[in-house]
């Protein structure tokens, strides 16, 4: 044990010198040696194996090391650590609902929707018009925001490598490029869901304040209750559980071989159902003829 302790101390000294020389590759190679000594002493095998796999993955790809797996500074890494988790949160879901989920209810309040009862805007077209226009606008804002963030961070810190391991717990070796693309595509799916659900609520409630109130109760209520024990068996049936693709891959209550496929089909099916119900409900409403 004394010999191992001395070896570890010497390795820490070498690591300190490597950091002073800003040689992160050498620092991490030494970390593998330290980890191997720790394994001999019965320390956390799972954590150490994951850390060693991460280090070897970066070295084998010939990449420059980030400061740490989940404290990356370059664009393609930091975006899935900071920006995407912020976008995939209840606060932003409510912002999406406010910007794109209440347009139909606002038209009811302004009585403007009555003027759409023309051959061009029939029962079906008015619902699809609101859906398509809001999804397009929000998607455009989404892409612009991501582009500015990537370019802005890239300008100051560099863009990094898309094949750098993300370091996400449970899936640490999945590359940043894959995580970023998955988040990007899923964002469009979430936008379509929220807009379609907002239209559904609007044709029944007809008041934008009520629509936002329902959204707030659902999203914030989900955040407050999702970690409660009694919710464990229910989470896999709630659409909000499938809003974040990384949660699908890493959370115990969702992770499965086909989790992402199930999520896509489930949310897509709900979008279609919401639109069909909205169109049917709209046809039962009374309008002033032009």
Where are these regions (language model features)?
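Terminal transmembrane helical anchor/hairpin motif
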Residues: 1, 65-79, 161-178, 209-212, ...
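Secretory targeting signals
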Residues: 60-105, 128-199, 203, 246-264
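Transmembrane alpha-helix boundary/hinge residues in polytopic small-molecule transporters
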Residues: 111-112, 196, 212
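Hydrophobic alpha-helical transmembrane segments
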Residues: 1-86, 203, 266-267, 271-290
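Alpha-helical transmembrane segments of integral membrane proteins, especially early/N-terminal helices
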Residues: 43-64, 106-107, 143, 147-149, ...
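Short loop-to-helix capping motifs
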Residues: 122, 206-208
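Transmembrane helix boundary and interhelical loop/hinge segments in multi-pass membrane proteins
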Residues: 100-115, 119
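Hydrophobic alpha-helical transmembrane bundles that constitute the permease/transmembrane domains
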Residues: 107, 188, 192, 220, ...
